[in-house]
């Protein structure tokens, strides 16, 4: 029932895009430049994982490339990302004796996505996990923690690596270094106001940019036309911080819900590409991160305890002291479960002991102290003291912990079917820690429809729009209904690189 309703909504959105295209075509023709202020081979819009990867590959293929970023600093959401990346087959995984394969990763992505994914892309993504990891290390010089391997919700086994600095900046800064080395200008405060499509050939040939744009001041900056002799590559990300647009897609995602995204995650280029005639699908599948902490704004740092310590090595319980979900289920299942608990007047908590936080301390040195200092989590000497301090019934909480400890000893969780990893130990060593849980709007699964090399499809004829490519969160049909945590970086780098290579090969 849910899927069919969403399919109807998606069809309606596409129909609206076609009508919008017809209504704006004449205006676009009238505005088409007679001359251009600047000319490049490839113009990349967006400076996150995907955009920078596309720029690097296009430049290496011989193209004259420029990257445009509307915000004052580069990186977008990528630079504040948690720095965890799926790396099936990596040394960290093998050192822990974890059995994994591209086929298992592919299955996990499809199951979480309710098989709404583009299967060819999912297969390519899974097969690219190890080569992508090696590319980031060997080509970019990214440093990952050598002995840390983690498991996000929905994955069958631990398979993500963590950047040495515990942030997506550990990758983005290396991409920016490579751009500088290759001579690729990354221009900030560049707001793309319009994408030009030749009224005769239908080819995308450039953009209208407001140079010196001051976010969020509409109309600021000097208008400049830029020609793309080969292609424009769209890597503009999602719209999680555009409340009006996200509520249009999913009315449940009101302003009451915080977002993990940077302020510039807005919808203007989603609207512009619809007007251009680009096909978009699954726009109403918008993910909320279940591990958010309500006592800080945005992504923050509290999620690191809620996910890395408690979901992977501890427990999630409600204010009655009971588990309410498999802590390693996919993000939608967990976020929905939290929303049900909150609707019924019960708070949700992430809890763990000294052993639970040990892997997080290794992955993210200093994070525990920062969370305690900011009162995002609270430390107690004993489980009983935690129960007393939070109002959770101690007898129920102790029973919940005891039951889980037995599951750890049995290496099987019959109640919630959670994966018990091979280094999990019972929860019994103080001190104890607790943090509150609340979902935050996080990722857009829908977006532009592309082929395997990032060519954007037209809504009228299902054929590629000449000169237009896309990658990253601006695209749809890769993750389907739910994106698995730690797969975003893999997606952005793999398909960003492919789009950049293909764009540079345009005649």
Where are the model-predicted features located?
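N-terminal secretory signal peptides and thylakoid transit peptides that target proteins
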Residues: 1-15
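Conserved redox-cofactor binding core of oxidoreductases
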Residues: 127-223, 229, 242-244, 293-294, ...
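Glycine-rich FAD pyrophosphate-binding loop
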Residues: 61-78
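Glycine-rich loop(s) and the adjacent beta-strand/alpha-helix scaffold that form part
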Residues: 214-296, 495-498
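A conserved FAD-binding loop/helix module that cradles the flavin
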Residues: 254-261, 477-503
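A glycine-rich dinucleotide-binding beta-alpha-beta segment and adjacent secondary-structure elements
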Residues: 396-482
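An anion/pyrophosphate-binding glycine-rich loop and adjacent beta-alpha core
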Residues: 270-274, 279-392
């Amino acid at each position: 029932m849910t899927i069919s309703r969403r399919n109807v909504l998606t069809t309606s959105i596409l129909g609206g895009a076609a009508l919008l295209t017809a209504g704006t075509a004449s205006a676009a023709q009238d505005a088409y430049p007679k001359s251009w202020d600047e000319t490049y081979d490839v113009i990349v819009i967006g400076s996150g994982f995907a955009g920078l990867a596309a720029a690097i590959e296009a430049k290496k293929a011989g193209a004259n490339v420029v990257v445009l970023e509307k915000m004052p600093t580069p990186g977008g959401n990528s630079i504040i990302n948690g720095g965890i990346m799926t790396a099936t087959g990596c040394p960290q995984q093998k050192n822990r004796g974890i059995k994994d394969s591209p086929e298992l990763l592919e299955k996990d992505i499809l199951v979480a996505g309710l098989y709404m994914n583009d299967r060819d892309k999912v297969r390519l993504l899974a097969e690219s996990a190890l080569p992508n990891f090696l590319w980031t290390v060997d080509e970019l010089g990214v440093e990952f923690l050598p002995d840390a391997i983690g498991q996000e919700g929905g994955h069958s086994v631990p398979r993500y690596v963590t950047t040495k600095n515990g942030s997506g900046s550990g990758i983005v800064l290396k991409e920016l270094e490579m751009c500088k080395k290759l001579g690729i200008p990354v221009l900030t405060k560049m707001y793309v106001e319009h994408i030009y499509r030749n009224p005769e050939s239908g080819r995308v040939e450039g953009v209208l940019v407001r140079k010196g744009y001051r976010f969020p001041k509409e109309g600021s900056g000097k208008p400049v036309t830029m020609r793309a002799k080969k292609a424009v590559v769209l890597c503009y990300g999602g719209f999680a911080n555009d409340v009006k647009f996200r509520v249009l897609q999913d009315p449940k995602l009101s302003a009451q819900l915080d977002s993990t995204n940077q302020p510039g995650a807005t919808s203007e280029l989603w609207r512009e590409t619809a007007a251009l005639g680009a096909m978009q699908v699954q726009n109403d599948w918008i993910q909320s991160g279940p591990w958010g902490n309500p006592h800080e704004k945005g992504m923050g740092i509290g999620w690191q305890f809620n996910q890395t310590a408690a979901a992977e090595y501890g427990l999630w319980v409600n204010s009655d002291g009971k588990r309410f979900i498999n802590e390693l289920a996919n993000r939608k299942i967990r976020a929905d479960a939290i929303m049900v608990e909150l609707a019924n007047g019960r708070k949700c908590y992430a809890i763990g002991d000294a052993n639970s936080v040990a892997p997080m301390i290794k992955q993210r040195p200093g994070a525990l102290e920062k969370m305690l200092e900011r009162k995002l989590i609270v430390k107690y000497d004993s489980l009983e003291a935690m129960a007393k301090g939070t109002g959770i019934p101690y007898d129920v909480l102790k029973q919940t912990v005891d039951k889980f400890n037995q599951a750890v000893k049995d290496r099987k969780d019959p109640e919630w079917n959670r994966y018990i990893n091979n280094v999990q130990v019972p929860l019994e060593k103080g001190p104890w820690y607790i943090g509150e849980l609340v979902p935050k709007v996080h990722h857009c699964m829908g977006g532009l429809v592309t082929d395997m090399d990032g060519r954007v499809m037209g809504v009228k004829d299902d054929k590629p729009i000449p000169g237009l490519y896309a990658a990253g969160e601006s695209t749809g049909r890769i993750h389907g209904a739910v994106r698995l945590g730690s797969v975003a970086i893999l997606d952005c780098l793999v398909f960003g690189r492919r789009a950049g290579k293909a764009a540079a090969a345009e005649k």
